[in-house]
């Protein structure tokens, strides 16, 4: 069964088709409610989510956003710093420290499930949380096998989603040869002054090309521009 979903996820031609295959895979693994988010960490701002899939109850999701639970959600916080999958119970086994966390976790209807954190270079990340629909006794029997299967599906779906997003970016924001050159040398750690000497142009022109690339890629720093260009397949280093 899982092998079938692997093939279908890899073959998904757009984000909507991929989300549908991901949802079907989650159902087959007895997941009652899931969330998938992907984006990047922004210096001084924290995580910025670019894609989000969920089958969560709209009323709960609305309350979650209105109350700002995402800022103190212990599952999210743990997922941003851990590198291996973990159970909801691993987090909820200790009492919350903040009143906001206590409020959220009292209202949170899911106590057993799995979080799969996924981290890539240059601050890219993805995260899947999956609340089980299994009865408590079956969950205890099967949870490690379920964790392995959900983790594989999450990793494959996230990789494919990143690839599709990169293809869309490459089509929407083509970079000029000069913009690519300045980003390529930036990726090698060269300063604007050094890039100017290498390319035989002025430092001001280097900054202009880098700034233009940043605008096209919708990022705020040179490092983010390099990361996004590499992820999109626009830049080979």
Q: PLM features: what roles do these ranges have?
A:
Residues 99-123:
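Helix-to-coil/beta transition segments that act as allosteric "coupling" elements at the rims
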Residues 38-62:
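GAF sensory/regulatory domain recognition
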Residues 191-224:
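Recognition helix of helix-turn-helix DNA-binding domains
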Residues 178-182:
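The N-cap/first-turn positions of alpha helices
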Residues 222-233:
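Short, basic, alpha-helical segments at the C-terminal edge of helix-turn-helix-like DNA-binding modules
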Residues 1-8, 15, 19, 126-176:
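Juxtadomain coupling helices with adjacent low-complexity linkers
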Residues 54-98, 103-106:
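Regulatory sensory and allosteric helical modules in signal-transduction proteins
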Residues 21-26, 30-43:
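Short, hydrophobic-rich beta-strand element in sensory/regulatory alpha-beta domains
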């Amino acid at each position: 069964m899982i092998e079938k979903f692997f093939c279908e996820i890899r073959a998904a031609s757009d984000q909507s088709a991929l989300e549908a295959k991901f949802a079907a895979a989650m159902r087959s693994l007895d997941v009652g409610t899931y969330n998938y988010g992907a984006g990047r960490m922004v210096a001084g701002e924290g995580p910025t989510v670019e894609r989000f899939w969920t089958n969560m109850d709209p009323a709960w999701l609305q309350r979650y956003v209105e109350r700002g639970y995402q800022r103190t959600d212990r599952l999210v916080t743990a997922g941003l710093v851990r590198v291996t999958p973990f159970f909801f119970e691993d987090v909820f086994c200790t009492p919350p420290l903040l009143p906001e966390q206590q409020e959220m976790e009292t209202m949170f209807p899911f106590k057993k499930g799995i979080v799969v954190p996924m981290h890539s270079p240059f601050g890219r990340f993805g995260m899947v949380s999956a609340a089980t629909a299994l009865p408590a006794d079956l969950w205890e029997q099967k949870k490690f096998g379920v964790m392995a299967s959900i983790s594989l599906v999450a990793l494959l779906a996230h990789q494919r989603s990143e690839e599709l997003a990169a293809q869309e970016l490459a089509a929407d924001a083509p970079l000029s040869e000069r913009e690519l050159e300045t980003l390529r040398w930036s990726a090698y750690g060269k300063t604007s002054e050094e890039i100017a000497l290498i390319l035989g142009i002025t430092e001001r022109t280097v900054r202009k090309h880098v700034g233009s690339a940043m605008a096209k890629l919708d990022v705020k720093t040179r490092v983010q521009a390099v990361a996004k260009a590499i992820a999109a397949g626009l830049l080979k280093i």
